[in-house]
Structure formats: structure tokens, C-alpha cells
Amino acid sequence: MNNILNVRDFGTSGDGHADDSPAIQRALDAAEGKSGTVYIPAGTYRIGKTLYAGNDTTIRCDSGARLFVCEKQTKKRGDFLLSNRDTVCGNRNIAVYGGTWDGNFDGKNNNKPADLFDPDAWSGSTLNFVNVKNLTLAGLAMRNSVVYYIRMAKLDGFVIRDISFASERAAYNQDGLHFGGEVRHGLIENITAEPGQTNDDMIAFNADDSMVRLENHDLCCGAIEDITVRGVYAENCYTGFRMLSVNSPIRDIRMEDIYLGCRHFAVNMDGARHCRTPLIRDGEKLNGSGHIENISVVNMTVWTTEKNGERALILAETELNNFRITGFRRDTARDVCPEKPTLRIALAPSSYGTVTENGAVTEYLLNTLEDTFCHRGTFGTAELNSGLTDF
């Protein structure tokens, strides 16, 4: 193989004590634009400054390579363990394979800033990819993130596979794969989490969000479309999927082979009404909100792992069009809260659909904001739609 750059040749120690970020960055700089591969051998690499990957760059890590965020450095907005280099004008053809990528959160070090709205605050995310065409992430062991493990926006063409999440300590807003807006044409497959993780949304499709929150600095709102998700496994995550749309569309999403134990939601489509930074306030969106369409969910098994008073495992408080679930199963043998509704649809006037269980079809029609439909227990298929015409 040509143009392989071993970071040891650029001066890394890999002993976990010295700051290896300058040496690794020299290797990344040498690879940029030359279809170069930066090889990171087994070792422990303390990273004191953000690593930046530029155009036409591949990073390949030995399975024994661990890179972690240095706890000794003061953090500021724009700091990460790894980011693409140019989030404004964009990058192309970036690939990262293998290794452990550690946010080094233990409750004492690398803590989330106290002021959620500090415009200069560190986001707390571990990996950052914004404005990238052709991104590949494969075989990454993501560990101990302060907030989002991997945050992304403005992606055009991506493959994310064989990603695992684990943390010694749970943290607030500890999303797994967090997508902001303007994301399209992607494949996500074989995503796993150890019990307890992720401690927020395992996969978040947030076409809309509050951009003044520190977690979302320099992300954006916008359409999320044409994505296939295959093979998502968690024994006890906070929430499996969030689909957050208020004004921007989420469409043409295919999800297959989902196996989730959830403390809160399997699929949350509440429009962020109940967050600390709600996007919909009382008196707004009286005709319904959101734009989620052409969603296919095939072979989903879910169960509740904690009694917490949540409204349902699948919560739809958003306008939906052609949202279809087939091969659904609620694992009642493992479910600790069987009385919790499986499906709840509300705050979506002019919504209609069907739920089929053992050949019996239940139809629903919501005429006003006050109307609600709930289904308890398991079901085989569900078809959810909106009567609105502005999709």
C-alpha cells in the first residue's frame, strides 16, 4: 500500500502521558489531499488539541489504539478529539477505521460547562463532522463522552458501521450518533451499546434543534433524507431514536432489524416540546407541527426497562405522512412496565391510520389538537398518516 504514514514516524510516544496531538497532526497534514492513510498503532494517545482531518484522508487504527481527550487542557468552543478541518467550506473523502475514541469523562474530568447558553463554551462532544462529502466511520469503539459521542451535520454521502458505545459513567445528553440538519444519502449499520448506554438518544435525527445550546454550537437545521439504518442493538438505552422535526423535513428513512430495551422511548417524535429548550411553545403550531414522511420500520423488537411515567414507547406528537411499521414486537417477557402504552399519537390534528394485531385492524382519526390515540401491548403493523396537504 502506498502513502501510509505511521504516526510513530512523526514522533508519537503512545504512552498515555505525553501529548501526542502535535505528532498525529503532522501525520494528518502530510496525508491531506494525497489519498494518504494515517496509521495509528497500538498504544494510548493523550490528545491535548483537536485533531483535524482534511480532504482525501484515511485514518486506520490498530485495535489496541486508544485516543483520549486530555483532561488537563482548558476547553473552548470548537474543541473535539477529532474533527474535519474545514466545517465552513467543507471537506471530502474522509474515512476513520478502528480504534477506541475516548471522551475521558469520569465525573471529575472534562465536565460539561455549567452555562448551557455560553456562546464560547465547549460542546463536550467527542467526534465532530460538519460539511463533509463522502464520510466513512467504521469499527470505532466510542467511550466516555461528555455529551454526544459523534455529532454530524451537512453530510452528503456517508457510511457509518460497526460502532459501539460504552461509558464508565452516564452523562446528560450522551447521544450516540447525533445528526443535525442538511444530512442525506447515508447508510448506518451494526450500532451497539453496552447496558446503560447511550444515556440519551442512541440515534438522533434532529432536523430542527436549539442552536444556542452549547451541545449544538456550529450545527444547523435542515432536511434529513435518504438514510438506511440496519441493525441497532441495546439492552438498556435511554431512547433508541429521536426524530425531531418542527419546520425542516425528515424523509425517506428506512430502519431495519432494531432490538432495543429502552428506559424512555423507542422512537421519540415529540417536537422537543418537553425539553429545556422547547422549539414549540404554548399557542404555537395550532395546526400541528413537523414534517416526517416516507419512513419505513421493519423488524423492531422493543421493551421498557424502567418505570418512569413516560407517555409511550413510540411517541408521535408530530405530523406524519406514510410512516409504516411492519414486523413489530413488544417483548412482554422482558418488559418491566407492560401498562405503558406502546404507541401514542397526539397534538396532530387531521391524523389517521391503522394498527393491526393478529389480523384485527384498529383505525384511528384525530380531528383536533385535543384528540389522542393510544395502543397498548404489541402489534404487527402500523400505518400512520396526516391529512395535511403541505408535505
Residue ranges and their predicted role:
Residues M1-F391:
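Extracellular/periplasmic carbohydrate-active domains that bind, remodel
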